[in-house]
């Protein structure tokens, strides 16, 4: 189980004059600091998939980066199975698989070599890495491009390789930042099936998305954030109950509570 309590993160604004008019009007801009995440809390238990929703700029990516230990929060806590992630980030990274919004593959390496390299970073031996790559290639349908250099990969090939690289060490928690963005229908379904497989294994998955059909299909829990704050946190049934119509209406109902406050 992962439990997040009252996460907050601000960034210094080097030159306020360069901000857009929209950014200047954002209430999170306070003096020379932009408070990207102000108060985010949620829980994801074993075997659950949690969908993290919010408009562009809500603080979703910053939140996920803090969960992955890529960013250190200014305040708040991240607990995985009773262990404080922020106090022991090196140990925590071995338990976490993180897909960032940017694939960042090494272009001169093949797909296999990209995954292999991350396996080595996690201390896996050669045989274990080879077996795991074979397993992931089967699950993510990667065999046709696995041994090609990644600089020529399509968006779907890059994303599949990045996902495989993120989970090569069989992490206890998987965090995915918009894993299906830019993918075609077939690649999207492959990735969604992979997430479903993680769920069936009991691995908690937290992923951000703008696609509410993915939330409908996969998620047990939903967290909506806006302007860096948790506006809704509950199960999918409670989320649907926010409005009697579509999930889009439920999402808008959660976001509109920001305005009403």
Give the ranges of each region predicted by the language model.
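Conserved ABC ATPase signature
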Residues: 149-153
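Catalytic Walker B motif of ABC-type/P-loop ATPase nucleotide-binding domains
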Residues: 174-178
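ABC ATPase "signature
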Residues: 233-234
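Conserved ABC ATPase "signature" region
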Residues: 18-27, 116, 120, 127-145
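Conserved ABC transporter NBD signature motif
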Residues: 76-87, 91-92
């Amino acid at each position: 189980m992962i439990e997040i309590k009252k996460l907050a993160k601000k960034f210094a604004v080097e030159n306020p004059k360069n901000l857009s008019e929209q950014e200047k009007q954002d209430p999170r801009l306070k003096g020379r600091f932009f408070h990207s995440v102000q108060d985010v809390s949620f829980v994801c238990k074993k075997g659950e998939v949690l969908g993290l929703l919010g408009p562009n700029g809500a603080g979703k990516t910053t939140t996920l980066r803090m969960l992955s230990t890529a960013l250190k929060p200014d305040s708040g806590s991240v607990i995985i199975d009773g262990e404080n992630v922020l106090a022991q980030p090196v140990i925590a990274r071995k338990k976490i698989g993180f897909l960032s919004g940017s694939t960042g593959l090494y272009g001169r390496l093949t797909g296999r070599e990209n995954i292999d390299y991350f396996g080595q970073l996690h201390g896996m031996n050669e045989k274990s890495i080879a077996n795991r790559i074979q397993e992931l290639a089967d699950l993510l349908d990667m065999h046709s491009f696995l041994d090609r250099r990644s600089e020529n990969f399509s968006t779907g090939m890059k994303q599949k390789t990045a996902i495989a690289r993120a989970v090569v060490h069989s992490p206890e928690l998987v965090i995915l930042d918009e894993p299906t963005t830019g993918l075609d229908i077939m690649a999207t379904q492959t990735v969604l099936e992979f997430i479903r497989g993680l769920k069936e294994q009991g691995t908690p998955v937290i992923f951000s998305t703008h696609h509410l059909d993915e939330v409908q299909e996969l998620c047990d829990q939903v967290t909506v954030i806006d302007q860096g704050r948790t506006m809704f946190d509950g199960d999918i049934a409670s989320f649907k109950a926010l409005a009697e119509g579509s999930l889009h209406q439920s999402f808008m109902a959660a976001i509109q509570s920001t305005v009403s406050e």
